[in-house]
Amino acid sequence: MAPKRRAPPASQPADGGKKAKGGQEEEEDAWSSALNALKTAPREKPPATIDGQCPLSAGPDAKVYEDYDCTLNQTNISANNNKFYIIQLIEHGGTYSTWNRWGRVGEVGQSKLLPFTSLEAAKKDFEKKFWEKTKNRWAARDNFVAQPGKYTLIEVQPGAGQEVALRVDGAGDEKVSKRRVLPCALDETTQKLVALIFSSDMFRHAMQAMNIDVKKMPLGKLSKQQIARGFEALEELEAALGEQPRSMSRLEELSSRFYTIVPHNFGRARPPPIDSPELLRAKKDMLLVLADIEVAQSLQAQKVEEEEVVAHPLDRDYALLCCQLTLLEDTSQEYEMILNYVAQTGGQVYVLNVWRVAREGEDKLFQAHDHLEHRRLLWHGTNVAVVAAILKNGLRIMPHSGGRVGKGIYFASENSKSACYVGCTSKRVGLMFLTEVALGKPYCITRDEPTLQQPPNGYDSVQACGRTEPDPAQDVEVTLDGKKVLVCQGKPIPMPAYKDSSFFQSEYLIYQESQCRIRYLVQLHF
């Protein structure tokens, strides 16, 4: 059991959070809403920096001339091509050079630095190389059109770092006045949690685990428009997968396009074609993780008021979540109940900490389902990289058009089932949500129904009945905000009524995002 710890001071959510929407409003699908948000995001002009492999990058007076800087990518599965090309025009000491570096994605590659006697000559060389590699004019790059057999322009945006130093104009010269940072108001354990869910190293590890090349899409430089193009490429792949008979050459072509837009590091291995619904779903989820990482990075990039006394960085990050996290004492009844829930239904996992969660505005959304009486506290596993986005925006309908139980939010009564979807840190630390789900009258199924987008008429949720279920006789009833909620406390036992079910463990599905309320965040070691 975790050592005894003090509870964090009660804190109030920041004012001005997102406005609660009426429960009767139709809720947007995460896929389409994420795509629309990314496509309509303001286009930011990146401040170009010299490629770190360039010998001039360490020079004090060297800089990229204006915006003469581009990263190109090309993937061709049939030819086992997965390569990049960097072109920059560098100004240094009154002279100009072009820098070119190229190679296989994930490797340093080869390079060439060419000095020129004039700016015009350097521009001409840069623009010529861009044309040779892309068959697009540099002057028309804002209307870039990908050409067969050529490189595609990869779009990045400015970094998300915040300055701590405040620049002050003095009399006659400029000086830097350090802001006084207030002590952190969070308890030590919650400080570590906030540091984890906003950690650049954690985001980088999550991206590497998905084979995303972090050199081409460095943290803080993920372009919203670039992610949107990835979404669109997957939509084309989904349509091609639905065609009968399937064309493998077409799937390879579209997969190559996707890998060109979202650079992946496969080493020297041949990039795999996305040729099954399972692989397509994995890439969809990957892009949603990328979008959620961008949400967390954007939260941190919000402008800080220029004050001489500023909140501690962890307090600022915590406030951005618009969510109250209360660390539970390991001697409390709540903690013991959750510890037993994990012990009875989980695998080889160890509970590190548990926080009670109160998301701003979620209680009002959840009230739209007060009439539903059948409620359970159920598990939801996710990647640690998206926890900040979930705490900020809530659980969303995942775009599993080919999922076993359709397009909804998936929960489980067995910790080991939801644990399959947890993405851990490099130290095998993961986070899971315990969520109150208003199930009402569930529609019970024993076979896959992947086309479901809502429960049948007369039902409020869907239960994929598993061949095992935590012993119902051991369920306990707790009261949360005046409502009775069932919590599993027994070991899974065979369910004779569902011995022929295609589901080994039960899953619970809702098709409205407001039909659940996050109650606890559980940190585990796997």
Curated annotation (Swiss-Prot):
Q: Which residues form the PARP alpha-helical domain?
A: 183-301
Which top EC class applies here?
A: transferase
**What SUPFAM superfamilies does the record point to?**
ADP-ribosylation, Domain of poly(ADP-ribose) polymerase, WGR domain-like
Q: Which Gene3D superfamilies does the record associate with it? A: 3.90.228.10, Poly(ADP-ribose) polymerase, regulatory domain, WGR domain
Domain named WGR is located at 61-151
Q: Which GO terms describe its biological process?
A: double-strand break repair
Q: What is its EC number?
A: 2.4.2.-
Q: Which GO terms describe its cellular component?
A: centriole; centrosome; cytoplasm; nucleolus; site of double-strand break
Subcellular compartments:
Nucleus; Chromosome; Cytoplasm, Cytoskeleton, Microtubule organizing center, Centrosome; Cytoplasm, Cytoskeleton, Microtubule organizing center, Centrosome, Centriole
Q: Which residues form the PARP catalytic domain?
A: 312-526
Which Pfam family, an example, fits this chain? Answer: PARP_reg
Single GO molecular function = NAD+-protein-lysine ADP-ribosyltransferase activity
* Renumbered residue ranges of the record's region Disordered: 1-55
Q: Does the keyword Transferase apply?
A: yes
User: What name appears for this protein in its UniProt entry?
Assistant: Protein mono-ADP-ribosyltransferase PARP3
Native species: Gallus gallus
The upper taxonomy is: Eukaryota, Metazoa, Chordata, Craniata, Vertebrata
